[in-house]
Design a protein with these regions (language model features):
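Class I S-adenosyl-L-methionine-dependent methyltransferase catalytic core
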Residues: 1-391
């Protein structure tokens, strides 16, 4: 049992990333620019957030009245690797002393119904929130009965009461987390790994326009605070330091926002060149056709031709530019190969592949998207198949 607990604690520590306030602010403001009333009268639930540590709680409680929230609910997970140790109470507000009376072992639940200038100093800030919570004035601060797992009955009941979920869930549980959001028909803005786009549980939701990428930070460097002792690649730690975050921080270059809230960037047309212009000014060569599927390879999103009516294979980074009014998603070239009718590569491709010195394990029945240029073989990484929408 002891070994099991240690293993679980280690896994939790290495799966816990604390989002920066500025990243949250930029993302939420993008939805407000598109629809200033999107949060008005809504219950926001942050169900993977220690209220004492989370910048999600900090952002929404400080902007409670500006957003017009009806209620803010936050719940934390026990044990939190950083609880009571790493971050100052309510983020980096140095004017607040740490409360000695707050629960130190149990997972916590905060329910905010009202915020106001309780100390009457002329401004609303985190001091007012702290005082309101300590006096239980119109708000609730209690330990949870369980461990705060988002799958627990206790947290599911809170989820049922909410309208919009905003958080950074454990990446290792992303599939299960998203499934729960759709099971309970919730709107959401959450952080995940860019590679989640290709998950067989996630991609069909993207294809059906039930889930899409958020407005900011997709595939770029996002910095996260991590628990002391968490395993961090030294290169990522150094990159975070170069971005101004020294210490227990990591940089994730493949993180992104996932949402089903609309935003303006999603409807911004992608500027394109014609096929001839791409060949002349960018690619410097003709488009290649796949050996085993009737589509062309487009290795860079900027090279999508405006005048090609057929199917095109593009990198997954395309989804950051995806406009559902401009393009139709046909499928995922790897996870949907059988459904799409992608043919096996055949023995000639296998022979050419190994003759070229490649070490991967493939056979003639393999049906990944592939193409030749002369005798040289190419296996593009993770292609999404798209076509222009007919006007």
């Amino acid at each position: 049992m002891a070994n099991s607990n240690l293993t679980n604690a280690k896994k939790a520590k290495n799966d816990e990333f604390y989002t920066q306030y500025g990243d949250i602010q930029k993302e939420i403001e993008a939805y407000l620019e598109y629809d200033s009333e999107v949060f008005r009268g809504k219950v926001v639930y942050c169900n993977c957030d220690d209220p004492f540590e989370s910048n999600f709680f900090r952002y929404f409680v400080l902007n409670f009245n500006k957003l017009g929230l009806k209620q803010l609910i936050t719940t934390s997970y026990k044990p939190s690797p950083v609880a009571n140790t790493q971050l100052a109470l309510f983020g980096d507000d140095k004017t607040l002393a740490k409360s000695k009376g707050r629960p130190k072992i149990n997972a916590n639940k905060f329910i905010i119904n009202e915020v106001q200038d309780i100390d009457r100093d002329g401004e609303f800030n985190l001091k007012d929130v702290a005082k309101q919570l300590k006096t239980n004035k119109h708000n609730e601060w209690t330990p949870l009965e369980g461990d705060g797992d988002f799958r627990s009955d206790e947290c599911v009941n809170l989820l049922k009461q909410s309208d919009i979920v905003v958080t950074n869930p454990p990446f290792s549980l992303f599939r299960e987390y998203v499934k729960q959001l759709f099971d309970y028909e919730k709107q959401f803005v959450i952080i995940g790994n860019m590679n989640a786009i290709t998950y067989k549980e996630i991609f069909p939701l993207i294809k059906a326009n039930r889930l899409w990428l958020g407005a900011t930070g997709n595939g770029s460097d996002m910095v996260f605070a991590v628990p002391n002792g968490a395993e961090i690649a030294e290169g990522d730690r150094q990159k975070a330091a170069r971005l101004g975050y020294v210490g227990d921080y990591t940089r994730l270059g493949n993180s992104c926002w996932f949402t089903n809230l609309d935003h303006g960037r999603r409807h911004k047309p992608l500027p394109l060149m014609t096929k001839a212009e791409v060949i002349k000014f960018s690619a410097k060569k003709p488009f290649e056709k796949y050996d085993n599927y009737n589509a062309i390879e487009v290795s860079f999103v900027k090279n999508i031709p405006s005048d090609f009516d057929g199917i095109m294979g593009v990198p997954i980074s395309f989804l950051d530019k995806y406009n559902p009014d401009q393009f139709e998603i046909i499928g995922n070239g790897q996870t949907m190969a059988n459904e799409l009718g992608i043919k096996p590569v055949g023995q000639k491709f296998v022979d050419d592949y190994y003759r070229q010195g490649n070490k991967g394990s493939i056979n003639a029945k393999w049906n990944n998207l592939v193409y030749h240029i002369g005798e040289k073989v190419y296996v593009p990484y993770q292609r999404i198949l798209i076509k222009h929408k007919k006007k």
